[in-house]
């Protein structure tokens, strides 16, 4: 008589979700506006909580506008809120402001954008497998699957202060890019290493209104407590920006300024354990008839996260005004249109755009919106998922009368 023995193979199925919502708020300028130069927006996640089989994500959106008055460039800021319910639980979530625009409303202005909420989580699938038994002769095989720990999240702070050799009249805008270089698993922790790349667009005390760009990279290392994580595991995680504070202290007598930046970041991650289970790929008996039900479960194996930098120089769709020179760029943004995978190659198509500010030959100011497409190829074995593209830096120049981007 056959007495079969069974085991269970647990595997993690990655699930992803994306929801885009709209938000807007009025922009109140304190003085007469000659021209709107640029508007952009940043979305900060304020909370993420499980609600049944969903994750409720809330975000604050900061709209930032640069405009021109009789006294030169000025800036203003306004805030809105957005929320969405992602149809997944325990998600690693992100929020991004897209399609930012300004429009006239009655006697004023309103800023609008879409907020794209994305998240990914893991759902455990269980499959029963034959492992042996009395009266059975089996052909063994090894089933490899992943098990993930619980997802953890915690905030930490990154700060920097630097001096510039000119007197700053005003910081027109600033942006922060969180570059994660590695996520490793340790004893009950996930270890994140990377840089917080800070870009400040400053307006000095001068008559030419040049916009000066300052860039700083602040390294960070953060150990996130993760229950069940061990050094022989892989780790999966993200770091996002939660809060930002930029302050300027100017000494006009010395013609110097000090710029301080404090960022609150949130690390979210988990450990990924590779489990090997012995199972039977075939079985028979010398004494009894054996009937097998064969099943090939779809098991995804996490091989790690890849990070890659790409430098592109491309002509845009815009021309430079005759006799004008570039003062700077504002409102830089990247948009991904499609991600397609085939035969081990993943192609990412998108575009980069920016507001290019010119000083005209008659000493006036012109803002030209320029955009250029891009295409990137990634070659990796296996399935590529959760592709993200960030714009780290952009320089505009005039070549042959056209605006060219290097990014």
Where are each of the predicted segments found?
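Viral structural modules
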Residues: 1-407
